[in-house]
Swiss-Prot record:
Region feature Disordered, mapped onto this chain: 1-37, 64-155, 250-269
Keyword Iron-sulfur: no
Location of region: Kinase-interacting sequence (KIS): 152-342
Biased composition (Polar residues): 19-37, 118-136
Entry superkingdom: Eukaryota
Record field: compositional bias (Low complexity): 137-149
Keywords: Cytoplasm, Nucleus, Phosphoprotein
Note: Present with 3590 molecules/cell in log phase SD medium.
PANTHER family: 5'-AMP-ACTIVATED PROTEIN KINASE , BETA SUBUNIT, 5'-AMP-ACTIVATED PROTEIN KINASE SUBUNIT BETA-1
Source organism of this protein record: Saccharomyces cerevisiae (strain ATCC 204508 / S288c)
Gene3D superfamilies in alphabetical order: 6.20.250.60, Immunoglobulins
Record-given protein name: SNF1 protein kinase subunit beta-3
Posttranslational mods: Phosphorylated by SNF1 in vitro.
Subunit structure: Component of the SNF1 kinase complex, a heterotrimeric complex composed of the catalytic alpha subunit SNF1, one of the three related beta subunits SIP1, SIP2 or GAL83, and the regulatory gamma subunit SNF4. The beta subunit serves as a bridge between the catalytic and the regulatory subunit. Interacts (via KIS domain) with SNF1. Interacts (via ASC domain) with SNF4. Interacts with REE1.
Length: 417
């Protein structure tokens, strides 16, 4: 290689050979600063991208090349593939370029290249926070919309509540109230009324309906003698109250329904979610006029208006008019004399649901079941006294109670003298 013309020799091969010979003579490795500088300068002057420089040129396989394109804002390459020193290129182990020599480049052009790459990386990293995916924007809009809906529903729930003042005036130091409005699980403390000793009260927001409650006075369950009382299923005395809505409260649901419909249309316009074709057609149909042309109009299903019913205190004429009462009794006399089938004029002695006593009815299942179980009783005879027909000079008296899905019948047999 030394005998060839220096002009025809490849510059890269000459520099590499000289660097290798100098390393052999001096007994040193690639740590020599002079050889590293010349080797770095040689590689920096080589244009490996131009196919006219080196013939024949073998294509180099790059695993990944970092390319920054400011026009492409949708996709940002992951920063995990970037090198901290800003080189920005990784080569395959099968490439002809030595990785150790490429990492030792410290020339001015290498520094400029590193600075440019670092600047581009910082520019791209600074641009990243301003670029937000559409999914994050949609998620933020959905959360804001849900908060608005929760606020509207909370206002609606508060609009259905009415203030109720519960008072206690029968002494005690610590007074609490619990009831059906708290599920009988929480106690609400009463506060004394200023200027009125011995009087304690609490103001609650309750929905319309019947509410039962009891007081806890100094760790003792009590009920107030100044409030309406009733008994629960266990026979304990409780207080109750009826919370009724104002007369003009019935018109509010219609107004709220109209406002909800208008808000729903506005929300559909503001929503950025993709709508299906059927939904878009439905919205367009609602905006179109009812007159479709050629004598056709759009049909709207409307609920019929309820008739206005009023409660009266008028007594029927059969109880006040003597002529009507006389005619009624004459009809009864004719029925008794002629034995005609006019049973509709005579009221029954017992309601129809009480005529069939459970003690007198026998189920077909009793032929197979010898346990003596009775059929499921009617709900109207629960907690009532029932009697059976007299059989064998014995009278049966029974009482039926229910516990969840079980019925217990207690029967007492009394002999007749």
């Amino acid at each position: 290689m030394a005998g060839d013309n220096p002009e025809n020799k490849d510059a890269s091969m000459l520099d590499v050979s000289d660097a290798a010979s100098n390393t052999t003579i001096n007994g040193k490795h690639s740590a020599d600063s002079t050889n590293e500088a010349s080797l770095a300068y040689t590689f920096s002057q080589m244009n490996v991208d131009n196919p006219n420089e080196l013939e024949p040129q073998h294509p180099l396989r790059h695993k990944s090349s970092l390319i920054f394109n400011d026009d492409d804002d949708d996709e940002i390459p992951p920063y995990s593939n970037h090198a901290e020193n800003g080189s920005g290129e990784t080569f395959d182990s099968d490439d002809d370029i030595d990785a150790s020599s490429s990492s030792s480049i410290d020339s001015n052009e290498g520094d400029i290249h590193d600075a440019d790459m670092t600047g581009n990386t910082l520019q791209k990293m600074d641009y990243q926070p301003s670029q937000q995916p559409d999914s994050l924007q949609n998620q933020g809009f959905q959360q804001q919309q849900e908060q608005q809906q929760g606020t509207v529903e909370g206002k609606k729930g508060r609009a259905m509540m009415f203030p109720v003042d519960i008072t206690w005036q029968q002494g005690g130091n610590k007074v609490y109230v619990t009831g059906s409005f708290t599920g009988w699980r929480k106690m609400i403390g009463l506060v004394p009324v200023p200027g009125q000793p011995g009087l304690m009260h609490v103001k609650l927001q309750l929905p319309p309906g019947t509410h039962r409650f009891r007081f806890i006075v100094d760790n003792e369950l009590r009920f107030s003698d100044y409030l309406p009382t009733a008994t629960d299923q266990m026979g304990n005395f409780v207080n109750y109250m009826e919370v009724s809505a104002p007369p003009d409260w019935g018109n509010e649901p219609q107004q709220h329904l109209a406002e909800k419909k208008a808000n729903h249309v506005d929300d559909s316009k503001l929503s950025k979610r993709p709508m299906s074709a059927r939904s878009r057609i439905a919205l367009e149909i609602e905006k179109e006029p009812d007159d479709m042309g050629d004598g056709y109009t759009r049909f709207h299903d409307e609920t019929p208006a309820k008739p206005n019913l009023e409660y009266t205190q008028d007594i029927p004429a059969v109880f006040t008019d003597p002529n009507v009462m006389e005619q009624y009794y004459l009809t009864l006399d004719q029925q008794q004399n002629n034995h005609q089938n006019m049973a509709w004029l005579t009221p029954p002695q017992l309601p129809p649901h009480l005529e069939n006593v459970i003690l007198n009815s026998y189920s077909n299942a009793q032929t197979d079941n010898t346990s003596g179980a009775l059929p499921i009783p009617n709900h109207v005879i629960l907690n009532h006294l029932a009697t059976s027909s007299i059989k064998h000079n014995t009278l049966c008296v029974a009482s039926i109670v229910r516990y969840k899905q079980k019925y217990v019948t207690q029967i007492l047999y009394t002999p007749l003298q």
